[in-house]
Curated annotation (Swiss-Prot):
Cystine crosslinks: none
Position of the signal peptide: 1-23
Keywords: Amidation, Antibiotic, Antimicrobial, Cleavage on pair of basic residues, Cytolysis, Hemolysis, Membrane, Secreted, Signal, Target cell membrane, Target membrane, Transmembrane
Name of the featured protein: Antimicrobial peptide UyCT5
Localization, UniProt: Secreted; Target cell membrane
UniProt propeptide residues: 40-68
Tissue and organ expression note: Expressed by the venom gland.
Family as reported in the entry's similarity comment: Belongs to the non-disulfide-bridged peptide (NDBP) superfamily. Short antimicrobial peptide (group 4) family.
Record bears the keyword Phosphoprotein: no
Originating species: Urodacus yaschenkoi
GO CC term (a single one): extracellular region
Biological process annotations from GO: defense response to bacterium; killing of cells of another organism
Length: 68
């Protein structure tokens, strides 16, 4: 009975190891594909599109209304 329990425990541990390593390898592979792909190299810095340095008068008026 102890032998069967030890085999079951080892099987569960190995299955967990395989399933977690599959997730890690797929994440690494998608990262490599993202870096080496055409779009991955062009869109390396996505934060530049989010920042707009110019603040218009309408934006300032809207912010003033929010702060009231």
């Amino acid at each position: 009975m102890k032998n069967q329990f030890a085999i079951l425990l080892l099987a569960v541990v190995f299955l967990q190891l395989i399933s977690q390593s599959d997730a890690i390898w797929s994440a690494i592979w998608s990262g490599i594909k993202g870096l080496l792909g055409k779009r991955g190299l062009k869109n390396a810095d996505r934060l530049d599109e989010l920042f707009d340095g110019d603040i218009s008068d309408a934006d300032l008026d809207f912010l003033r209304e929010l702060m009231r």
